[in-house]
């Protein structure tokens, strides 16, 4: 599938840095677009920056679980990634077999959402 892509024959693209400069920052790196990036763009204007990092990068496991791609991160990225690592313990494999009482929890989450988000979002 990738054999016909001419980028595969450019030696500079086959280095750790590729087209990027060391320490350029993850905001300068083209990454695949998925649900994490989508919800980040929906919520970024309403949440603290730390929460934005958690939303945007919580599925970037090579970086926050394995410590990969440090050479692309800015000092600010490295600082913010402590929040991504903190969040990861509540993300994958943290589900309980016991179903929560949605009606009991609803007021808490409605208040939390109202604290950060306007009544209507631009989806």
Give residue spans per PLM region.
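Intrinsically disordered, low-complexity polar regions and short flexible loop motifs
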Residues: 109
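Broad structural signal for hydrophobic residues in well-ordered alpha-helices, predominantly aliphatic
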Residues: 43, 112-113
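Divalent metal-dependent catalytic cores for phosphoryl transfer on phosphate-bearing substrates
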Residues: 1-103
């Amino acid at each position: 599938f990738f054999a016909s892509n001419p980028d595969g024959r450019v030696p500079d693209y086959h280095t750790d840095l590729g087209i990027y400069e060391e320490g350029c920052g993850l905001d300068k790196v083209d990454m695949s677009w998925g649900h994490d990036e989508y919800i980040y763009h929906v919520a970024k204007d309403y949440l603290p920056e730390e929460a934005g990092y958690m939303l945007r990068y919580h599925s970037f496991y090579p970086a926050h679980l394995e410590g990969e791609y440090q050479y692309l991160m800015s000092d600010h990225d490295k600082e913010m990634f402590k929040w991504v690592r903190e969040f990861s313990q509540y993300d994958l494999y943290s589900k309980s077999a016991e179903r929560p009482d949605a009606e009991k929890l609803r007021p808490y989450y409605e208040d939390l959402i109202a604290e950060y988000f306007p009544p209507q979002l631009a989806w």
